[in-house]
Amino acid sequence: MKLGRAGEVLPFSLKSRVEDVPMTNPEELIGAAHAGCFSMALSSLIEEAGKVPGTVETSAKVTLEQREDGFWISEINLITRGSNQDLTSEELVALAEKAKSTCPVSKLYSS
């Protein structure tokens, strides 16, 4: 599968859902898109607040469930870590909450 403007090729396989193989799957790509979008939204909000974003890193844990009617993504949990001396914990949490409502991928999943 080719991704992005540069045409990066990623090995793509059904096996990656259940085995430890060096390939990816749709669920991992969805999680990566959500995590990346959220980090970008949060960094932008930090800059808009007149602060220096520092480091913002987000990872996603995508839960895939098998139900009677097939597989479903039941939830995506984002874990964000950052380093910024300009923000209090309270300010960062408030901006992260706002990022949840401004990140386009978060909007998609909340609709």
Regions found by a protein language model. Give the residues of each.
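Extended beta-strand/beta-hairpin segments
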Residues: M1-A32, S39-S111
